[in-house]
């Protein structure tokens, strides 16, 4: 089974005048979609991820969004309504199948690299969030997924008042 999920890698916004339907302005959105942006959706797929018959295909697409300039601000943009959004180009794709694929995108090298003694230092969810840019509840969902895949484990000891995690070497879970 393959699940396909689009990621808006680039987006263009066009503003429509609600009076006559003409395009007022068009600009490129500063927001860029990344593979890690799907972290919050992965929690709901965690029962399937890790199964050799399951793969997740992420499509990096260019999107065009049209919004009505009917908002409450002077230019009508704040609180405006989306009129339509659709993909205009496929910029690339990423297929995640094996635990190593997920490690490449969701487990930063700084946290997965062992120290000089060969031990993986423990880290907290906050350290993981800072290293990856995954925020909020998605942080814990992603760590749960990485645990299920055998890439990280929860440590016995806490770090301050926080749970500790550590990366597992490939030979430890093989």
Annotate each predicted stretch with a short phrase.
Residues 25-101:
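Long, low-complexity, charged/polar intrinsically disordered regions in eukaryotic proteins
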Residues 1-4:
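Conserved catalytic cores of phosphodiester-cleaving nucleases, focusing on short active-site segments
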Residues 133-148:
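Short amphipathic alpha-helical interaction segments
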Residues 113-132:
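Short acidic, hydrophobic short linear motifs in intrinsically disordered regions
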Residues 97-118:
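Positively charged, polyanion-binding regions of nucleic-acid-associated proteins
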Residues 157-174:
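Short, cationic-aromatic polyanion-contact patches
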Residues 147-158:
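A short, conserved structural fragment
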Residues 10-15:
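Switch/connector loops and helix/strand junctions flanking conserved nucleotide-binding motifs
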């Amino acid at each position: 089974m393959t699940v396909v999920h689009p990621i808006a890698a680039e987006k263009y916004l066009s503003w429509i005048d609600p009076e006559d339907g003409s395009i007022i302005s068009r600009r490129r959105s500063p927001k860029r979609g990344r593979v890690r942006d799907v972290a919050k959706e992965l929690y709901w797929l965690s029962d399937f991820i890790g199964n050799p018959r399951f793969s997740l295909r992420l499509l990096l697409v260019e999107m065009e969004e049209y919004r009505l300039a009917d908002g409450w601000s002077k230019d009508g943009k704040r609180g405006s309504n989306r009129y339509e959004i659709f993909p205009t180009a496929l910029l690339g794709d990423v297929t995640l199948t094996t635990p190593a694929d997920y490690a490449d995108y969701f487990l930063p090298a700084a946290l997965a690299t062992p120290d000089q003694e060969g031990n993986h230092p423990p880290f907290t969810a906050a350290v993981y969030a800072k290293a990856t840019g995954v925020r909020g509840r998605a942080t814990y969902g992603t760590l749960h997924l990485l645990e299920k895949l055998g890439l990280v484990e929860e440590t016995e000891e806490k770090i301050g008042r926080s749970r500790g995690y550590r990366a597992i070497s490939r030979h430890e879970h093989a």
